[in-house]
């Protein structure tokens, strides 16, 4: 119905212009024909006093092997409804370098020019791009990406750390569909030189990497690794791009960095949520509110309101159900029962489970 009304509005506007006397006019402007895309709407409430920020920490531009300018990459992120974007062009792989001549800081500098207008936090990063076993490594919160352009990848990591960088091991299952934790990664983790793992990259995720995050206390990360145009890459009517949800003390670059180093993140991939038990529990409790309508013995009727746009798949009393975003449902429960959130992942074989009694 809205589309029909809008179409009739446009038709009437253009008809009026067409029927009006045009003789002698230089230009006829039709501003009502311009309807800017309003973007994706993903609402997740703040969690336990922290600011909930939607982030993409892995993106590319024409300054490495991406298809669009850094400024446009930032505007795409704004349209996606993100709060934070990191520009992480490849250090070693720059197929456009013959006709786009610039150093490794230029893409961030250009992205930074639209930070204020876009209302995003723009972070400088870079991707150390080597073959396995070390693979690809993102360094975030850099001050000089040129310092990473060295022969030894371990020296590049150290140079990033000297700038106070957050180090993320990218897409561990790419390109050979095997998420092996090599000795080089174990050594870097032991030395506290890897802080997080990208458990989701673009259209795939790596269940073994969930286990690595839990075992070693690393931050769960998920990003698009976008190279092309976002609207040509993602069917946003089906699923939005993957993102890292960060719980920050403040909405600032410093706040984001502190949160990542502290491990306060959950990864969103469609309706799948991946993170530590603590962070998943905090997120679910922030999104869902409960009201006990009536109690009869060990049975209760509970009204559940989902304040977020996230959809939660649950298993309760061996029955599957869905709590849709921005919806309210009434559920009959036993007070000694447990509810499993089946689209959450802590490890490859563990989900978030909550005692019903703890929700009262």
Question: PLM features: residue spans?
Answer:
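Sec-dependent N-terminal signal peptides
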Residues: 4-13
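Sec/Tat signal peptide C-region and signal peptidase I cleavage site
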Residues: 16-20
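Alpha-helical transmembrane segments and their juxtamembrane interfaces
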Residues: 12-13, 68, 99, 235
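Conserved catalytic scaffold of divalent metal-dependent phosphoesterases
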Residues: 172-174
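A metal-dependent hydrolase metal-coordination microenvironment
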Residues: 33-163, 170, 179, 192, ...
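Charged catalytic cores and adjacent phosphate/nucleic-acid-binding surfaces used
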Residues: 2, 21-55, 74, 134-142, ...
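Generic beta-sheet signal
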Residues: 165-167, 220
């Amino acid at each position: 119905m809205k589309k029909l009304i809008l179409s009739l509005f446009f038709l009437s506007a253009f008809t009026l212009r067409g029927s009006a006397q045009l003789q002698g006019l230089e230009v006829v402007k039709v501003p009502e024909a311009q309807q800017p895309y309003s973007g994706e709407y993903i609402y997740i409430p703040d969690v336990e006093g922290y600011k909930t920020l939607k982030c993409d920490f892995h993106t590319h531009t024409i300054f490495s092997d991406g298809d669009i300018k850094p400024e446009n990459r930032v505007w795409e992120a704004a349209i996606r409804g993100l709060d934070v974007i990191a520009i992480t062009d490849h250090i070693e792989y720059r197929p456009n370098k013959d006709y786009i001549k610039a150093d490794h800081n230029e893409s961030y500098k250009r992205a930074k020019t639209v930070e204020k207008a876009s209302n995003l936090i723009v972070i400088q990063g870079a991707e150390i791009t080597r073959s396995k076993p070390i693979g690809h490594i993102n360094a975030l919160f850099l001050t000089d990406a040129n310092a990473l352009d060295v022969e030894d990848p371990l020296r590049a990591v150290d140079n990033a750390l000297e700038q106070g960088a957050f180090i993320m091991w990218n897409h561990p299952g790419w390109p050979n569909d095997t998420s092996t934790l090599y000795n080089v990664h174990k050594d870097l983790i032991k030395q506290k030189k890897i802080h997080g793992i990208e458990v989701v990259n673009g259209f795939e995720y790596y269940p073994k990497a969930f286990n690595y995050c839990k075992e070693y206390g690393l931050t769960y990360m998920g990003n698009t690794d976008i190279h092309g145009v976002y609207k040509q890459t993602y069917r946003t009517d089906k699923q939005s791009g993957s993102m890292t949800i960060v719980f920050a003390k403040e909405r600032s670059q410093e706040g984001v960095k502190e949160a990542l180093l502290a491990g306060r993140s959950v990864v969103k991939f469609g309706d799948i949520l991946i993170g530590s038990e603590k962070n998943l529990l905090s997120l679910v409790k922030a999104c869902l509110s409960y009201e006990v309508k009536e109690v009869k013995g060990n049975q209760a009727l509970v009204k559940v309101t989902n304040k977020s746009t996230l959809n939660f798949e649950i298993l309760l009393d061996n029955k599957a159900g869905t709590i849709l975003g921005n919806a309210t449902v009434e559920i009959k429960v036993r007070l000694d029962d447990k509810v499993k959130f089946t689209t959450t992942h802590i490890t490859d074989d563990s989900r978030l489970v909550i005692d019903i009694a703890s929700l009262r």
